[in-house]
Amino acid sequence: MTFKASVLTLYPEMFPGALGLSLAGRALEAGTWSLEAIQIRDFATDKHRTVDDTPAGGGAGMVMRADVLARAIDHASPPGDTRPRLLMSPRGKPLTQARVRELAAGPGAVILCGRFEGVDQRLIEVRGLEEVSIGDFILSGGEPAALVLLDAVVRLLPGVMGNAVSGEEESFENGLLEHPHYTRPQEFEGREIPQVLTSGNHKKIAAWRREQAEQLTRERRPDLLGAHPLAK
């Protein structure tokens, strides 16, 4: 089954962008996933192709119109489409590796890239949009966030990563940050590769990596400890 991504945006030329390269790009060419970037302005009805208006109650900036966006969503996601409808938004629920895995296991996603001050709340409610955030910071639009989300999802699709074990050992997959990595040369500016990693004792190596992952998580992301069954 091909993972189908439909992105609603004012800047379709931003796609596939970096997703046309490396793992995601090869998977796109192979048909493992598909991408359509839909111009929201095509669903405006006035000669100026207006997609926004002033906020009710006053205030700075502009708000994206519910009627225009609804037509765009209905075009991308007609009745019977089971793909989740996502709105990239700084006030959304933080994107987690668990949610990424859920999306990768599904048929695809319809992604709305917000602009200006945001989207009319009525659209979010009536079209059942899931608001998603990639972090506690503000971007100029939802497009970079959509690229981040899709990159995280596509790499988990079957056959995209050459070594499935590589993905299983990454940060967040087991509730911990990933352990440090080393490779040749053996010595670099006075620092040696930890001896245990060249010992050939796989049990000791696994224990060292787990210990390092736990230590890094305690130092940098203590909020993760206890939140995942494998991190306890």
From Swiss-Prot:
InterPro entries: Alpha/beta_knot_MTases, tRNA_m1G_MeTrfase_C_sf, tRNA_m1G_MeTrfase_TrmD, tRNA_m1G_MTases_N, tRNA_MeTrfase_TRMD/TRM10. Residues 211-223 have a biased composition (Basic and acidic residues). S-adenosyl-L-methionine binds at G114, I134, G135, D136, F137, I138, L139. It catalyses: guanosine(37) in tRNA + S-adenosyl-L-methionine = N(1)-methylguanosine(37) in tRNA + S-adenosyl-L-homocysteine + H(+). Residues 211-232 are annotated as: Disordered. Keywords: Cytoplasm, Methyltransferase, S-adenosyl-L-methionine, Transferase, tRNA processing. Gene3D superfamilies: 3.40.1280.10, tRNA(m1g37)methyltransferase, domain 2. Its EC number is 2.1.1.228. GO terms for biological process: tRNA N1-guanine methylation. Specifically methylates guanosine-37 in various tRNAs. Belongs to the RNA methyltransferase TrmD family. This is tRNA (guanine-N(1)-)-methyltransferase. It comes from Mesorhizobium japonicum (strain LMG 29417 / CECT 9101 / MAFF 303099) (Mesorhizobium loti (strain MAFF 303099)). The gene is trmD.
